[in-house]
Amino acid sequence: MAELISFVVPTQSDKVLLVWDLSTGPPAEALSHSLFTVFSQFGLLYSVRVFPNAAVARPGFYAIIKFYSSRDAQRAQKACDGKPLFQTSPVKVRLGTRHKALQHQAFALNSSRCQELANYYFGFSGWSKRIIKLQELSGLEDAALAVPMQKGSPQFLCAVEVVLPPYGCRSPGVGISEEPLRQLEEGQSSFLMKRKTAQKLAFQAAVSDAFQKLTIVVLESGRIAVEYRPTAEDLDARSEEELQNLIQVSCSSWSQSSQREEECLSDFSLEEEDLKLCDPH
């Protein structure tokens, strides 16, 4: 049976491993590194988190490891359970258990995580992304009312397209971001920094949005396929000019973007050729 992998934070119990009976010698950071080295051999990991045992238990640590693929998690569990791995005593490895009645909201992966997942399954040359439109929204309302525009918080809208040539697939995405400009942060340099940050965040949100419409299909043979599920607005956006319809709809749902996984700017790098579209004249 084929496995479907979406570009969301993995929460299903069959993708989560619980590892315990970890020794007390190494610190938690060293244990996390060792666990990552061992378990990443079975597939791409979302996270490795190490915790100290409860006070009522004997000294030691346990870990929670999240895979993107349930198949990878099951293979890792069978291969590592009861083995010493990187320590002298064996560890216990179990698949996570969770009551079926519990429902957890699926949070979209941030752009860095989306690209990491795409690189793993499609290869670095198996996909690409491009900016279709980058528009500054700050002051547009004042301009429409013929009111002199004041320098406020920079707000940008970005439309991108993720392209997968081997699969003949294109997925559009839209993101909006605003960087609040406080009164104490006056001056041209502060405004330009906020403006550049807003551009980056809008780009990140657009890339993540494009990946949300894609699902990785891992066949039993190990081959990879892609499922594309466009929204109704995407079906109307057949050309770059028609993307205005998609942009207008996305503006109305901007408030929903706060529910997505937060992304740190330190994990993101925007190529200079992308920024050429953003530089103020």
From Swiss-Prot:
It is found in: Nucleus; Cytoplasm; Nucleus, Nucleolus; Nucleus, Cajal body. GO terms for cellular component: Cajal body; cytoplasm; nucleolus; PML body. The keyword Electron transport does not apply. Residues 1-92 are annotated as: Necessary for nuclear localization and for nucleolar accumulation in response to heat shock. GO terms for molecular function: DNA binding; RNA binding. InterPro entries: Nucleotide-bd_a/b_plait_sf (IPR012677), RBD_domain_sf (IPR035979), RDM1 (IPR040224), RDM1_RRM (IPR034200), RRM_dom (IPR000504). Keywords: Cytoplasm, DNA-binding, Nucleus, RNA-binding. Residues 90-133 are annotated as: Necessary for nuclear and nucleolar localization. Residues 15-98 form the RRM domain. Its main location: nucleus. It comes from the Eukaryota. C-terminal half contains cytoplasmic retention domains as well as determinants involved in its stress-induced nucleolar accumulation. May confer resistance to the antitumor agent cisplatin. Binds to DNA and RNA. Homodimer. This is RAD52 motif-containing protein 1. The lineage of its organism: Eukaryota, Metazoa, Chordata, Craniata, Vertebrata.
